[in-house]
């Protein structure tokens, strides 16, 4: 175990916690409660930093920690909360009783972030589709305005990108299997490919 002397302070242990250290911290917090972790470290006799004590208690020692794999309901809640809050793991973990923010973050990074539909669900509400040629997100008129871009004339990005294929595409012309949103954004059904819209000659 490494010990480091900080200027004007006593030695601070680093590295793995020993079972006897866990017992000291657990016993002290159960007797005196949580509070100033640097003070807890000093009063309990542990030669650990306050942050180290806090994280050890929060992630490993507190009695209400839930162990075991995530349930489907917990997975679904993590995906929905991440879509709403982003990487604010402590807030997400607050909605999952017994789960720590560190556990939720690790679970997201190892299991959920790699799933294609979780990435899709995680896209901001204002990005509702992608152009079939560049795979760039199609932004809503409101989002373009907030970025200082034009409105109606810039809603035709997809139309301009199809022109070099020699197809006669006009704004407002009906195309099958394309959804029109109120803000003129086009959304393609991902079940169909480019050739479903434009057969190759």
Swiss-Prot record:
SMART domains: SANT. This is Transcription factor MYB82. GO terms for cellular component: nucleus. It is found in: Nucleus. Homodimer and heterodimer with GL1. Part of the WD40-bHLH-MYB complex. Interacts with BHLH012/MYC1 and BHLH042/TT8. Interacts (via N-terminus) with GL1 and GL3. GO terms for biological process: positive regulation of DNA-templated transcription; trichome differentiation. Residues 9-61, 62-116 form the HTH myb-type domain. Keywords: Developmental protein, DNA-binding, Nucleus, Repeat, Transcription, Transcription regulation. The keyword Transcription applies. The keyword Aminoacyl-tRNA synthetase does not apply. Residues 37-61, 89-112 bind DNA. Mainly expressed in the trichomes of new leaves. Residues 112-133 are annotated as: Disordered. The N-terminal domain is necessary and sufficient for dimer formation. The C-terminal domain is responsible for the transcription activation function. Transcription activation factor positively regulating trichomes development. Has a function nearly equivalent to that of GL1 and can complement gl1 mutants. At least one of the two introns in the MYB82 gene is essential to the protein's trichome developmental function. The MYB-binding box (5'-TAAGCCAGTTATGTCT-3') located in the third exon of the MYB82 gene is required for MYB82 function in trichome initiation. GO terms for molecular function: DNA binding. Its main location: nucleus. InterPro entries: Homeodomain-like_sf, Myb_dom, Myb_TF_plants, SANT/Myb. Induction: By auxin (IAA). It comes from Arabidopsis thaliana (Mouse-ear cress).
């Amino acid at each position: 175990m490494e010990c480091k002397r900080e200027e004007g302070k006593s030695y601070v242990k680093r590295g793995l916690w020993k079972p006897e250290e866990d017992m000291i911290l657990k016993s002290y917090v159960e007797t005196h409660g949580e509070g100033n972790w640097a003070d807890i470290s000093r009063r309990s006799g542990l030669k650990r930093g306050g942050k180290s004590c806090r994280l050890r208690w929060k992630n490993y020692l507190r009695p209400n920690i839930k162990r075991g794999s995530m349930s489907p309901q917990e997975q679904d809640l993590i995906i929905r909360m991440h879509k709403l809050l982003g990487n604010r793991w402590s807030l997400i973990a607050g909605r999952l009783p017994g789960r720590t923010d560190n556990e939720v973050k690790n679970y997201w990074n190892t299991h959920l972030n790699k799933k294609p539909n979780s990435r899709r669900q995680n896209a901001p509400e204002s990005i509702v589709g992608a152009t079939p040629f560049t795979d760039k997100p199609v932004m809503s008129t409101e989002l373009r305005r907030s970025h200082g871009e034009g409105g109606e004339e810039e809603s035709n990005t997809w139309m301009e990108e199809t022109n070099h294929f020699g197809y006669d595409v006009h704004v407002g012309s009906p195309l099958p299997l394309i959804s029109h949103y109120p803000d003129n954004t086009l959304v393609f059904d991902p079940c169909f490919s480019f050739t479903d819209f434009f057969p190759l000659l």
